[in-house]
A protein has these predicted regions:
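Short S/T/G/P-rich N-terminal loop/turn motif that feeds into the first structured element of a domain
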Residues: 1-67, 74-90
C-alpha cells in the first residue's frame, strides 16, 4: 500500500469542504485511491491522508490529481508527501 498526505487551505467552511471531497472521490478512485481521511488542522487548513492501490500510478499522476482536486473542491494545496505504508493495525 502507498499513502499520500496533502495539506490544503480552504475558506474555513468544513461542511462544504467535506461535501466537495465526497463529490470528487469517484475521480480519485479512478486513479487508484482506496481510502481517504481528512483532518481539520487549523481555522482554514486541513490535511488529507489517501491510501492508493498502486505506488506507480499515484506517482505518475499525483500533480494532476491534486490540481484537479483543488479545482473541484475549491481548495489550494500547500504541501504534501508520499510514502509506502509501514504498518496497518486495526
Amino acid at each position: 500500500m502507498f499513502v499520500s498526505f496533502t495539506d490544503w487551505e480552504f475558506d474555513g467552511n468544513v461542511e462544504n469542504a467535506v461535501e466537495n471531497m465526497k463529490g470528487f472521490w469517484p475521480e480519485m478512485k479512478k486513479h487508484g485511491a482506496t481510502n481517504m481521511r481528512a483532518t481539520v488542522t487549523g481555522e482554514k487548513t486541513l490535511r488529507t491522508m489517501t491510501i492508493w492501490s498502486s505506488e506507480e500510478q499515484v506517482k505518475a499522476n499525483i500533480d494532476e490529481i491534486r490540481a484537479a482536486a483543488g479545482k473541484a473542491v475549491g481548495m489550494t494545496t500547500t504541501g504534501g508527501m508520499m510514502r509506502k505504508v509501514a504498518v496497518e493495525l486495526e
